Amino acid sequence: TMGKGEGFTLHNTKMNYTDRCGVCKDIAGSLISFLRMAGLEAYPAMTMAGSRVESIPADHFNHCVAVVKLSNGTYMPLDPTWVPFCRELWSSAEQQQNYLPGVPEGSDLCITPVSAPENHYFRIKANNKLDKNGKLTGQFTLTAEGQSDLNIRRIFTTGWQSDWKNSMESQLLSISPKAKLLKVDWSKNPKDYQAAPIKITFWYEIPDYAIIGNDEMALVPLTMHGLYDQVRSYLRIDTDIPERQYGFKDGCSRLVELDETIQLPQGYRLVQSVEDNRKSPAADFEGYIRQENNKIDIHQKLALKKRVYEAGDWNGFRTAVNAHKAFGNHLIINK
């Protein structure tokens, strides 16, 4: 950088490359140059990453992005700093965020739109079998898109290839130190994030997974046992608080879909079925736990509709998330 006097001034592209500048404004400036070379109308914009900007003339900015003019005359924000290895052009970790475009006609403060939960789905489909000794064997497939994809794929795009399998194994070991990863399939080239949403399939066995009593067992559904909790940022929000006076934030809007079947040992039955359904402007939840023949079927669908919530959204958000968390309680099966 220039040192003293650097400020918010964008350098020209030649200086960015000859001086090897590399902060956000230099990355955004380079993108603007490339877009203009392609015949598009593009300009810089300022924002405050992760926070709001007050509607007063003051320095409330810490991040430089770009805007490009579309055929309908509107401007689309682009963030080349945040979207490498992400399947978006504007990071939805910055949704509902203020920005100020530096366009010739002038502009008031703008705000980025909400991204629909299904743009950031996180899905696990698991098929498991429990034996009479409490050992669980099975297979699950994980798929994700948007910000959920970015989080899960990070080990492949920025990590050492020699660590890939260890990272997969650590997900199972977080469930039980006895867990064994038998096989994992992360597709042909998981680093190619632009090809398709991430998909990983695990095969495993976990001895002593269930707690055994006299003609009964207790177990937590595998899909609620800590798998990829780093993606589920909503779990880090304290939903024991009954009321909030102020707004709150999550990492991103998100759709979580968890489906699991558990084949039971001969003669065992699920003690109690569960069904729940919650809807609100902030979040929705639907789910059930029930037995069909000798299998337990578990289904959950949690839709978190925003990144930035108002205090009035708390009851709907809290109710949906707590209903989802309750599906992580122990299931009791007996003869």
Predicted features and spans:
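A sensor for short, sequence-defined functional sites
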Residues: 1-335
